């Protein structure tokens, strides 16, 4: 243990005549950790009763199969028993006149015996479990040699208490720490210009144990050595840390010669520690200072320049004392009231989910062990994490974790935009919160407070700026599947997913995205070359768009598979079907930016298939949509009443008198490898009124029949899920447009009679209506996938590519793609945001002069 805070912590004097045991043969090699069941963790309880336990130590005690302890007070014993009833006191292995080394061997062995049985074992040693302790180091070394996982956790040592109670910093001007017997036995060097701490001064040269204490017969040998270096009048601080809450700390000043007084000598016990302050300070080495660039050549150090403040307590008369408020200190204090945090300062800005997760990982050993085995599982199953936070947890990078938790408002704003692009609920909430503050002159502050409550410590203005920046420089804004027209024909589906671009289901190599322009080249092994200019089309310019106009992300530009680049722009891509119903790619898997087909599009008879309780698919009744005025839907002999249609999704409820509930998504399928049956198809869920909604799709239908209903359902579910992503994107876009309008309105709200206010209010009202329309689409989509987790884009398949088909009847005369300016394409913006250089931690560089060389290898508790 770390200190002589109790009478059990005494050194075992070495027997210089002891038999020398040869080292084990070179063939002896430790086994890799963790090959065997069982785990050993040694923790420290600190010196002060209970209060100096670390949170990690307590958690390990609570979760252990077996606990063994040597502690300094009965209150700590009681605390350990309260945390784990399977606890054993190792103090019982001490005995009068029994060699302490025998005791330490036995202490280690009882822990190892339980470890070898496969148990999770925790050893608790008072103070720091690795400082002046033998059993802990012995047990860990043997456990590792035998192939078990074994580690030590630090504790609060007696020296830590001494530094705090006496008020010294070991780095100024350096500190030597010795065990008193070892100092004498090996004639250790003393440096009177540094602090000196001597442990176990009350049992010098003694190797056995005495319950009633020791006769310190060798004490004068220590005083002789100290007097040789420091002189008889140098101060010695007799220190004993307080243990129980009712205890008081002993800090008594004596001189070396006063310690020879028999009355004072009796006050020194086995738990006593000595502190000797510096006798004089070492002068600055001017040559080294010049080499380090800390002093110009030819300059001299002024008298008093090295005077420390706070002063060293009880230092000798040759140690100068500085002053609290000199010129430099007064100048620094004068600047305090005008201080503004610098741009590089990043306070804690993390989601509540991230903060809770990191706290749990730091204080719950079992949770951390589970995370270590599968970081992605925790990252993907924890709700409320932002995308960067999830990535940081998946990688386990200390640098990434720091960067996502200590961020700027601009960084957090980008995280919010990324989150609401994928979470329509968050986007809807933001829309409503913004609109509620339209006429409030303090609206920015109110919205900022709301954002902070959601885990995003940023402002709507920063979010607005982030949205504009991400439209130009981040593919996250455009994440979806796009149907394309190339040279008047249906082109390949282009998918943007998790920062990766796909042509059909082929990954695009070495693409670049900058200033809203996406480029790639066939010279890099791609099946084509392209220069595509992206834009998010909105109607926030104050001019209403024609009915059924496309609103959402699209791109225009150049796409070619061979030869030279086309002379004029030849490509249009949209998140959804084109007005005529033509298109390509995923066969109709669009987004909120298209209005969806009329019910008449889906008139036909569909052979249906349903999932059985055994998990297989079986054919069921025919679903028919009649070509009558009402477009009646029947299922076998049953008529469906009061159904609704939105964005190619039909739904009905048993509460309206239907035999079951259903939500189904329709699409026009073009043959692919995954789904070779052509024509209208649907996929969705059906369930009885008495049953909960199924967790996954369980119903599919198509014109004709299929030998693989499971494959058909899976392919259609993928298309439906990509449509969901498109709908979510539409909600996010409308939320951003509304936020921009509200910011303008808040700025004009100071004068509600002005034309600027009226125009801003009208724009905000219109943006709110547009947002509500997008949210209505999303509500239907939410119903379709009720009880399912939001789609994980890392797992979601890429829709199969379809062959080029002629859609020359598609009317695109109103689409102007001839003036696409791609001359300013910047492909120099190579993304190196994921280069992790933050893992270098230099905040805890230890420049103290602590001498730990040749610590007495037989010194023990």
Swiss-Prot record:
Biased composition (Basic and acidic residues): 772-783
GO MF annotation list: methyltransferase activity
CDD domains on file: OphMA_like
UniProt-annotated stretches for the region Disordered: 575-596, 772-801
Sequence repeats: 805-809, 810-814, 815-819, 820-824, 825-829, 830-834, 835-839, 840-844, 845-849, 850-854
Primary enzyme class: transferase
Active site: 100, 104, 126
Post-translation changes: AboMA automethylates at Val-805, Val-807, Thr-808, Val-810, Val-812, Thr-813, Val-815, Val-817, Thr-818, Val-820, Val-822, Thr-823, Val-825, Val-827 and Thr-828, Val-830, Val-832 and T-833 before being processed by a prolyloligopeptidase which likely forms a peptidyl ester upon removal of the follower propeptide, which then undergoes macrocyclization with the N-terminus of the modified core peptide.
UniProt feature, compositional bias: Gly residues: 579-593
InterPro entries reported in the protein's UniProt record: 4pyrrol_Mease, 4pyrrol_Methylase_sf, 4pyrrole_Mease_sub1
Region Clasp domain, annotated ranges: 280-408
Modified residues (N-methylthreonine): 808, 813, 818, 823, 828, 833
Modified residues (N-methylvaline): 805, 807, 810, 812, 815, 817, 820, 822, 825, 827, 830, 832
Gene3D superfamilies attached to this UniProt entry: Cobalt-precorrin-4 Transmethylase, Domain 1
Membership in a protein family: In the N-terminal section; belongs to the precorrin methyltransferase family.
Function: Fusion protein of the methyltransferase aboM and a type III borosin core peptide; part of the gene cluster that mediates the biosynthesis of a type III borosin, a highly methylated cyclic peptide with potent biological activities. Type III borosins derive from the C-terminus of the fusion protein, and it is the same protein that methylates its own C-terminus using S-adenosyl methionine (SAM). The C-terminus is subsequently cleaved off and macrocyclized by a prolyloligopeptidase to give the final product.
Domain-level remarks: The type III borosins are defined by the overall architecture of AboMA and are distinguished by their additional 400-amino-acid C-terminal domain followed by long and highly repetitive core sequences. Within the homodimer, the clasp domain wraps around the adjacent subunit to position the core peptide into the other subunit's active site for iterative intermolecular methylation.
Protein's name according to its UniProt entry: Methyltransferase/ribosomally synthesized type III borosin cyclic peptide precursor aboMAa
Lineage: Eukaryota, Fungi, Dikarya, Basidiomycota, Agaricomycotina
């Amino acid at each position: 243990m770390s200190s002589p805070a109790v009478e059990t912590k005494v050194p075992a004097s070495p027997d210089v005549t002891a038999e020398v045991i040869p080292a084990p043969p070179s063939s002896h090699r430790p086994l890799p950790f963790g090959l065997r069941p069982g785990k050993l963790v040694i923790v420290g309880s600190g010196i002060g009763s209970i209060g100096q336990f670390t949170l990690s130590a307590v958690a390990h005690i609570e979760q252990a199969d077996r606990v063994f302890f040597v502690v300094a007070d009965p209150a700590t014993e009681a605390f350990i028993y309260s945390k784990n009833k399977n606890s054993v006191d190792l103090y019982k292995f001490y005995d009068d006149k029994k060699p302490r080394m025998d005791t330490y061997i036995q202490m280690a062995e009882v822990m190892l015996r339980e470890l070898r049985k496969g148990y999770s074992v925790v050893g608790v040693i008072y103070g720091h479990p690795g400082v002046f302790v033998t059993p802990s180091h012995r047990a860990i070394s043997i456990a590792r040699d035998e192939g078990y996982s074994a580690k030590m956790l630090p504790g609060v040592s007696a020296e830590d208490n001494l530094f705090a109670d006496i008020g010294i910093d070991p780095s100024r001007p350096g500190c030597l720490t010795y065990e008193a017997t070892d100092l004498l036995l090996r004639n250790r060097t003393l440096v009177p210009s540094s602090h000196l701490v001597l442990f176990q001064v009350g049992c010098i040269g003694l190797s056995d144990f005495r319950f009633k204490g020791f006769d310190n017969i060798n004490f004068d040998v220590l005083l002789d050595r100290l007097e040789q270096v420091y002189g008889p009048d140098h101060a010695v601080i007799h220190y004993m840390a307080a243990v129980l809450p009712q205890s008081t700390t002993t800090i008594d000043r004596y001189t070396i010669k006063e310690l020879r007084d028999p009355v004072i000598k009796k006050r020194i016990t086995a738990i006593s520690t000595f502190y000797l302050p510096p006798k004089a300070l070492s002068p600055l080495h001017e040559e080294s200072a010049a080499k380090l660039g800390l002093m110009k050549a030819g300059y001299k150090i002024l008298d008093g320049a090295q005077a420390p403040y706070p002063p060293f307590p009880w230092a000798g008369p040759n140690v100068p004392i500085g002053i609290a408020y000199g010129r430099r200190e007064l100048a620094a204090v004068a600047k305090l009231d005008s201080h503004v945090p610098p741009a590089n300062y990043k306070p804690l800005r993390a989601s509540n989910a991230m903060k809770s997760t990191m706290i749990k990982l730091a204080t719950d050993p079992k949770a951390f062990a589970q995370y270590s085995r599968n970081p992605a599982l925790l990252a993907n199953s924890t709700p409320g994490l932002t995308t960067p936070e999830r990535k940081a947890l998946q990688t386990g990078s200390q640098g990434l974790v720091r960067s996502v938790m200590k961020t700027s408002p601009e960084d957090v704003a980008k995280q919010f935009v990324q989150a609401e692009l994928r979470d329509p609920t968050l986007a809807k909430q933001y829309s409503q919160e913004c609109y509620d503050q339209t006429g409030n002159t303090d609206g920015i502050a109110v919205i900022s407070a709301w954002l902070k409550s959601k885990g995003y410590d940023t402002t709507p203005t920063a979010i607005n700026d982030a949205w504009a920046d991400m439209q130009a420089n981040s593919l996250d804004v455009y994440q979806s599947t796009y149907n394309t027209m190339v040279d008047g024909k249906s082109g390949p589906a282009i998918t943007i997913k998790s920062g990766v671009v796909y042509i059909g289901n082929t990954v695009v190599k070495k693409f670049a995205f900058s200033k809203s322009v996406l480029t790639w080249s066939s010279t890099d092994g791609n099946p084509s070359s392209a220069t595509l200019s992206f834009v998010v089309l909105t109607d926030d310019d104050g001019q209403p768009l024609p009915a059924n106009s496309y609103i959402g992300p699209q791109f225009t530009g150049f796409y070619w598979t061979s030869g030279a680049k086309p002379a004029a722009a030849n490509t249009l891509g949209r998140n959804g079907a084109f007005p005529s119903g033509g298109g390509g790619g995923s066969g109709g898997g669009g987004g909120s930016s298209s209005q969806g087909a009329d019910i008449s599009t889906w008139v036909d008879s569909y052979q249906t298939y349903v999932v059985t309780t055994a998990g297989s698919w079986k054919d069921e009744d025919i679903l028919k949509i009649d070509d009558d005025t009402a477009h009646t839907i029947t299922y076998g002999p049953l008529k469906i009443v009061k159904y609704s249609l939105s964005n190619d999704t039909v739904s009905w409820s048993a509460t309206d008198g239907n035999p079951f509930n259903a939500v189904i998504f329709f699409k026009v399928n073009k043959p692919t490898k995954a789904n070779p049956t052509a024509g209208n198809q649907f996929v969705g869920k059906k369930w009885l009124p008495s049953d909960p909604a199924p967790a996954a799709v369980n119903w599919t239908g198509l014109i004709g029949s299929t030998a693989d209903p499971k494959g058909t359902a899976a392919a259609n579910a993928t298309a439906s899920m990509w449509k969901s992503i498109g709908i979510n994107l539409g909600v996010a876009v409308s939320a951003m447009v509304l936020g921009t309008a509200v910011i303008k309105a808040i700025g004009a709200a100071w004068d509600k009679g002005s034309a600027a206010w009226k125009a801003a209010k009208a724009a905000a009202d219109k943006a709110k209506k547009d947002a509500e329309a997008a949210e209505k689409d999303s509500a239907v989509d939410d119903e379709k996938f009720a009880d399912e987790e939001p789609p994980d884009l890392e797992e979601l398949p890429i829709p199969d590519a379809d062959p080029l088909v002629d859609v020359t009847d598609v009317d695109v005369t109103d689409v102007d793609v001839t003036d696409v300016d791609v001359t300013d394409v910047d492909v120099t913006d190579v993304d190196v945001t994921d280069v992790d250089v933050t893992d270098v931690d230099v905040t805890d560089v230890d420049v103290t002069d602590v001498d730990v060389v040749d610590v007495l290898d037989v010194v023990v508790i």
